[in-house]
Amino acid sequence: MPPTVAYFCMEFGLHEDFPIYAGGLGILAGDFIKSAHDLKRPVVGVGLRWARGYSRQRLGPEGVPTDEFPEYPADFLDDTGVRVRVRVAAREVEARVWRVERWGNAPLLLLEPVAEGDRWITRRLYEPTLDARVAQEILLGVGGVRALRKLGLDVEVFHFNEGHAVFAGVEMIAERMAEGVPFREAWDQVRQQIVFTTHTPIPAGNEVHPQAELRRLGACCELVDWEMEQLGGNPFNMTVAGLRLSRRANAVSALHGEVSRAMWRDVEGASEIVAITNGVHVPTWQDARIREARGSAIGLWETHQALKRELLDAIAARTGAHLDPDVLTIGFARRAASYKRSDLIFRDRARIDGLLAGRRLQLVFAGKNHPDDAEGRRIVANLVAMARRYPDMVVFVPDYDMGLARVLTRGADVWLNNPIRPLEACGTSGMKAALNGVLNLSVLDGWWPEACDHGRNGWAIGDGADGVPDQDGRDLEALYATLEGDVLPAYADRERWVNMMQACIDVAAARFSSDRMVEEYFARLYARG
């Protein structure tokens, strides 16, 4: 029998009507528990019920994005009747445990404070203050373990998807120490039950907290300072703790595995990091009409054209922009982070002016900045400025969510991805596009080196070099060379284009589904030995 797995994550993306996700981490978690359900694997998700979810993005008159945090209807939450208590600073916080199974997912348990005075903890996903962030992580980790115990679930594997959940491991050690087991022995016992997934390929992106603040806020669960330091160092590094608390860890693509092993190689006592490439939930992200049309060149092209018209209609309804269905349409939709270089294509003004003036291509952008990220806000404002500079040729669609993501990854002709290599851990939006026959034009980062057959199922931007002088300039030149020399000529040859569409659908369906990912987790991460 496969082990029963508790999958901890700060966010879960199941549907746009349930906005408790911010980006790729949450969408991955949602796809994971959907595939676990489809495969009848014994998995239960553990997270938090965010009162207002993630932001609703609005554009001001000058094109600067603003954020709203509306409440959302949640009549699909089932109360388990279980209540747990955790200490946050000087206060005992009682939390209700909800259960969600509405979207064809494995059971998802969500904790939420009962008292109105404690609801600040789950008011908003990823609060910027230290007190709020640590309180959220205490509720997720410590509260999550206590909820599983109270529900009587016999969990054999505790999977921490990113470092936010590591206080669950601290709580599990404290449980054993309360029974008289010495710290080191308790740690060794707990480690046999924990696995850990790391996502962040740069040290600065990994969360670190002053140990004194963790003690003040109650995250130490009765462990003394030297014991906490053994786990995560001082200051306490959440990723280091995840690596030391787990018997096995994984990165989320082959390249990310190389980067992560190099980044954490000097951490004493860290678990081995293997690479398990992410995947996406095919029934959620692949249009059923594409599945039906596979194998028919005429049917595939006609289906794609229908999906493209649906995208352009949605853009017109949301923005008033009217794009041309006969023009090559490039999509770019992802979180507004500087390393993703969303505006790279605009940095050679003469070349983009020529392509757009000649109506050879049109560009569709979407993506949210973190509400407290000024640089991300500037990135979005710049994309809006480009849309105003090139009306009906460039468009920015606000309020990117799962619903818009489905329309974009089904209706674009090409999916553009140009991060600074190797900073994109995986990049699952490209997998969603590929499932629908949307061809990737991407830097060789994340998942794409494993999938790209240049000129046959998509295109590589550049040669995969990183850390080189003027990387932006090199990648920009490679982007234009590939776009002008390969992509545009291929689009003019319908037979070749449709063959490439079929090839990219085949590779995405065969190798980059979340069903494959879940099976690989059970075989390589959860299994003993």
Task: Give residue ranges: language-model regions.
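Catalytic cores of carbohydrate-active enzymes across secretory and cytosolic contexts
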Residues: 1-529
